[in-house]
């Protein structure tokens, strides 16, 4: 899953469980990878609620078609300071799965935590 993700912090901070079923993030990697523009109090609140993530989402094949998924209007919010999915990868997604509009935010991976009102305003405008 991380192939072609040069610049992503994920490779250095993720821990796959012994049974291969879940991924956790090393505690010292959580803020720089996902919440770099959040204050420490917000990150502490988030960390109290994080749980291991299933690896199934990364292993399960997905089948799409241009007639079905390709016909759904899409928008994308580029997060320029994202350390989980580097900007070049986000731009690749937009190029290969056209989105209109593409909104660029100078935020980390998680604008829903660092700039929730601004993000909500963008989403409301899209609706």
PLM features: residue spans?
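Conserved loop-alpha-helix segment in the C-terminal half of the alpha/beta-hydrolase fold
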Residues: 80-106, 113, 125-126
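Short, amphipathic alpha-helical "lid/cap" segments that border enzyme active or binding sites
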Residues: 116-124
